[in-house]
């Protein structure tokens, strides 16, 4: 899987869910998928394929047919060690160990927010800043992205993953039941492997909560033009 995807793309000048972002994501996911399968072929050459492997049935599967031709040829030659290889995990906590890069395929929840940490003696609240913002790059945050755009990114990544994808689709506080229902129907129609929605005005106090008051992080926010590399700073 991946983490930090949104930060990486936006530091190359591609705002989340834009055409450039989607093209960047497809390149990343193609490389990830193909080389995961290639590595599993190398293991199969050494240790054998997984017990239920049937070459004909496996190579006829819809997902395997999307692999690059050189990977399919390698499977024919070597077999494959693992039945499943790719997923997009919920990496919110893991990403904190890398200075709070954007988690998984998610956009930053906010440029800075309060994170609730449960402990034996209660809980504490920590102020957390988005990594890209501290490096001077202005990112689109989760609540600035429409539910439709969230869903498009989810559907795009799902094509390259053979198991599950963790992706939250943020919906507005005024979303009605029919709109909410249609989001799940569209996810199914697009072939998504699951969908999670989040409405900030829910009854439960969230683990992550956007800060609406207080000082702005001390970083100059810039947009990077991917064609020229020039920065336009606020």
What is each PLM-predicted segment?
Residues 1-12:
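Core structural elements
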Residues 1-2, 22-37, 64, 68, ...:
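Generic structural signal for well-ordered, non-membrane alpha-helical segments
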Residues 4, 15, 67, 129-132:
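Poly-acidic low-complexity segments
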Residues 9, 40, 44-47, 161-165:
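Alpha-helix capping/termination and helix-coil
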Residues 14-91, 183:
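Internal maturation/activation junctions in enzymes
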Residues 61-62, 74-81, 86-217, 222, ...:
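Catalytic alpha/beta core of large soluble enzyme barrels
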Residues 227:
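Acidic, glycine-enriched catalytic cores built around paired aspartates
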